[in-house]
């Protein structure tokens, strides 16, 4: 077992170096990711936990859970995760100020239009912000590395709960990526009203280009508005499988908001939802700065 772990650690190190050196040419100015192999008794073992701290260091943490049998599959996944976290630093939110402004946008939308829902918005805003940021960075990475990004996204969805049984608002991030990428993520959504809402949201993410930093706040507002509207629909009319939207279902798939906040620092990125506060900073939460 220990020998295998060392092999996987070596593969991870080489894959990370290939991204930092081969794709970003050692120009990032952030430390190399810290890696860890999680044990089966760890709460995040099935999905792993991946995030970047949004602070002065922008330290990436890659905590790998259940490992694939194929070394090549693992190597490809490490590269995808590394690119994902790097792009939270390079693209969205890009800096601490933008991260905090994205959180404020979501809080403002909630307080002005949806405060009657009774959601703990200070707790939830990080996850929602991380979802919006993930759409942006994953779409950028999809157009740069389509096959690797697509395979990783499909596998990630399959690691979570059965997405067909998830409420509408919990599918929003994945369906929006599917619409933007123009290719199937094997979600096989049949709710035509929901698909129309997603198409409209995807068009708003396309305005001025997916990477336009001046548009990030507007895109975050539109995502939050759509998210809360779908949340209401889920409360009033649960899907056919009887799954009712609840506040805890914002990341039914432990993949949504890799944003969880630790120690007051926000982290973004990974794709796993951690009960606390979300951290972006990749891909979730406030104050701090970390993203998943």
Regions found by a protein language model. Name each.
Residues 1-292:
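Short, functionally important secondary-structure microenvironments
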């Amino acid at each position: 077992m220990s020998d295998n772990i060392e092999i996987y650690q070596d593969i991870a190190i080489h894959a990370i170096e290939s991204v930092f050196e081969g794709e970003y040419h050692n120009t990032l100015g952030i430390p190399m990711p810290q890696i860890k192999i999680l044990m089966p008794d760890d709460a995040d073992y099935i999905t792993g936990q991946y995030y970047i701290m949004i602070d002065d260091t922008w330290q990436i943490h890659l905590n790998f859970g259940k490992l694939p049998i194929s070394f090549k599959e693992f190597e490809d996944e490490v590269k995808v995760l590394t690119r994902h976290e790097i792009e939270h630093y390079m693209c969205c939110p890009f800096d601490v100020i933008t991260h905090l402004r994205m959180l404020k946008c979501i809080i403002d939308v909630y307080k002005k239009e949806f405060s009657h829902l009774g959601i703990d918005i200070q707790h939830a805003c990080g996850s929602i912000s991380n979802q919006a940021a993930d759409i942006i960075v994953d779409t950028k990475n999809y157009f740069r590395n389509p096959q690797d990004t697509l395979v990783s996204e499909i596998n990630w969805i399959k690691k979570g709960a059965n997405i067909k049984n998830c409420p509408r608002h919990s599918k929003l991030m994945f369906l929006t990526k599917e619409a933007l990428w123009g290719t199937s993520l094997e979600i096989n959504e049949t709710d035509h009203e929901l698909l129309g809402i997603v198409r409209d949201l995807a068009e708003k993410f396309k305005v001025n280009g997916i990477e336009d930093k001046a548009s990030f706040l507007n895109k975050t507002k539109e995502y939050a508005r759509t998210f809360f509207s779908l949340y209401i629909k889920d409360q009033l009319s649960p899907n056919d499988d009887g799954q009712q939207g609840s506040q805890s279902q914002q990341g039914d798939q432990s993949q949504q908001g890799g944003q969880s906040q630790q120690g007051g620092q926000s982290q973004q990125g990974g794709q796993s939802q951690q009960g606390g506060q979300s951290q972006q900073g990749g891909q979730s939460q406030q104050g701090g700065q970390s993203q998943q």
